[in-house]
Amino acid sequence: MAKREKKSYVIQSVGNALNLLEEFKGDRDELGVTELSKRLDLHKNNVFRLLATLEAKGYIEQNKATENYRLGVKSLELGQTFIKQLGLGRQAKPFLREIVEKCNEMAYVGIIRQNSVIYLDVEEANQMVKVDNRVGWRIPIHCTAIGKVQVAYSSEEELEKLGILDDMERCTPNTIVDRGEFLKHLKEVAKQGYALDNEEYNLGVRCVGVPLRDYTGRVVAGISVAGPSFRMTDEVLKKEIIPAAKAAGEKASKRLGFGA
């Protein structure tokens, strides 16, 4: 009786909408109406209505170029809340503190979503002159250490899907905006295991970024250390910042199951 009563509360249309959202969990970033119809075993008209409703609420968005659909900002916001409560931000927190204790520079963790990096957590340093970064802020991928280090292990095709190769805004005179030069730079980042932002996003600010990997070896986030250029000299980067960042990234990745 109890099971029958519980089942009676299930709303089929809501269930269909949630099933549709779950189809975007795999490797495919975008899906079309026909494929969703087959996967969900629903008529195309029903899929259209579900997509229209979810799009109106911001949980799904349409790529106008391909006419396929992908997750929208609202889905991202729900994911951010979950991560903040249970995931990466909390997992990385002690390692951010470790960096700050060693280097006395700001450290933060971020993930790539919707063609930008989103900060999940920030650990401040006790400095009079500091970089202004806050949880929830979005920054570009192509001109930041935390962005570049997360895409450095991606194929050119994957980078195309992210949409950053054709939209590399020049934020400072140091920003790399040439496609070929950027791809060459990413290969070097992947080889050395860390990325540098040499005043590419903000003049007067330098950053180091290292990857965070999960139990599959996939890069799921990045840790970065940022500070004013007059403190983040080449010597300081080499002797203090880069070793501390790499050590923290390795420990955080191990906590996420990498190498287990």
List the predicted regions and their residue ranges.
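Sensor-regulatory modules in signal-transduction proteins
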Residues: L212-Y215
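N-terminal helix-turn-helix
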Residues: A2-Q85, G89-R90, E250, K254-F258
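Juxtadomain coupling helices with adjacent low-complexity linkers
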Residues: R179, A221-A260
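Short, solvent-exposed recognition segments
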Residues: V129-Y201
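All-alpha effector-binding/dimerization core of bacterial HTH-type transcriptional repressors
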Residues: Q80-M128, Y153-E156
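Short hydrophobic beta-strand micro-motif common in sensory/regulatory domains
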Residues: R206-V210
